Regions:
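Residue-level signal for well-ordered alpha-helical scaffold segments within enzymatic catalytic domains
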Residues: 41-42, 79, 83, 119, ...
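His-Asp-centered catalytic microenvironments across diverse enzyme cores
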Residues: 10-13, 95-233
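Generic structural hydrophobic/aromatic packing signal, biased to beta-strands
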Residues: 22, 81, 88-90, 132, ...
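Secondary-structure boundary elements
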Residues: 1-65
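Glycine-centered secondary-structure boundary/capping sites
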Residues: 17-26, 79, 144-145, 188
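Active-site neighborhood of thiol-dependent amide/isopeptide-bond enzymes
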Residues: 51-116
Length: 233
C-alpha cells in the first residue's frame, strides 16, 4: 500500500504551491469521503478542461496552469489524494482520436495519431478500488457543450467526451465510479503504481517535430476551441 501513497517526480505534493493549496482548503481535516469529494470537485471544476504542453508535467505545473486534460488532471488529482493519505493508482488506456474531434480540427486533427494515450485514477475507498475519470471536463464547459448539442440525448463522442448518456454522464462522485471518456477506449494498458511508471512505458505517438508542434501551436488552437465552447460561441 505504501507504493500508492508515495511522492514521485510527477506527484510532487510537497511542492510549495500544492502545500499552499492544501493549507487553504484544509482537506486533511475532513473525513475520508469528504476529502475525496472535495479534491474531486476541485480538480473537475476549478482546474478547467484544457491542453497542457505535454502529459508528463508535475502536479505543481498543472496547478499553476489552472487547466488540464485526462492525464494531467489525473496527475494533480493523485498528488492531492496522496497528500491527505488516500491511496491511489493509475490505469492506462488508449482512446480513439475521434473523442477529440471538435476540440481538435482540420489539419491538426488529420495529422494526429489514431490512438491517444489516456488514463483514469483508481482510488481506494472502503476496501475497494473506484474508477475515477469524471473530473476531466469542468461543469461550465460540459453544460455549454450539452446546450450546443441539446438534441442529443443518447451517446456522444467528440469535444473531449465519449459517453452513452450525453445529457447525464456519470461525473458526480458519491462513493461510485465516475466516467466521461470511457466509451472512447480502444485498448487497456493495465494498472500502474504511479503516472511516472505509466508514462515511462506509454507515451503519445508523436515524432519530435509533431511533439514540438503540439506544444507550441496545436494545443493553443485546441484551447481556443475549448474556450469558445465554454463561452457559448
Amino acid at each position: 500500500m505504501r507504493a500508492y501513497l508515495q511522492e514521485t517526480e510527477l506527484l510532487n505534493y510537497s511542492h510549495p504551491l500544492i502545500q499552499q493549496l492544501m493549507n487553504s482548503r484544509q482537506w486533511d481535516r475532513l473525513p475520508k469521503k469528504e476529502q475525496i469529494l472535495g479534491i474531486y470537485n476541485y480538480v473537475r471544476d476549478e482546474i478547467l478542461f484544457g491542453y497542457n504542453r505535454e502529459d508528463t508535467i508535475p502536479a505543481s505545473e498543472v496547478l499553476q496552469n489552472g487547466y488540464g486534460q485526462c492525464n494531467t488532471k489525473g496527475i494533480l488529482f493523485m498528488a492531492l489524494l496522496r497528500a491527505v493519505g488516500v491511496p491511489c493508482r493509475m490505469h492506462g488506456f488508449a482512446i480513439d482520436k475521434q473523442l477529440q474531434k471538435g476540440a481538435m480540427r482540420g489539419w491538426y486533427y488529420q495529422l494526429s495519431p489514431k490512438e491517444i494515450v489516456h488514463s483514469w485514477v483508481e482510488v481506494q475507498y472502503e476496501d475497494k478500488w473506484l474508477n475515477i475519470e469524471g473530473f476531466i471536463l469542468d461543469i461550465p464547459y460540459l453544460t455549454k457543450l450539452q446546450q450546443k448539442f441539446g438534441q442529443c440525448t443518447g451517446s456522444f463522442c467528440g469535444y473531449g467526451i465519449a459517453t452513452d448518456d450525453f445529457q447525464n454522464p456519470d461525473i458526480y462522485w458519491d462513493e461510485n465510479d465516475t466516467y466521461v471518456q470511457k466509451e472512447g477506449i480502444v485498448r487497456d494498458f493495465g494498472i500502474y503504481d504511479s503516472p511516472d511508471a505509466f508514462f515511462s512505458v506509454h507515451q503519445q505517438r508523436l515524432s519530435p517535430f509533431r511533439k514540438m508542434m503540439f506544444s507550441r501551436v496545436v494545443r493553443h488552437l485546441m484551447n481556443r476551441n475549448v474556450r469558445r465552447i465554454r463561452q457559448g460561441k
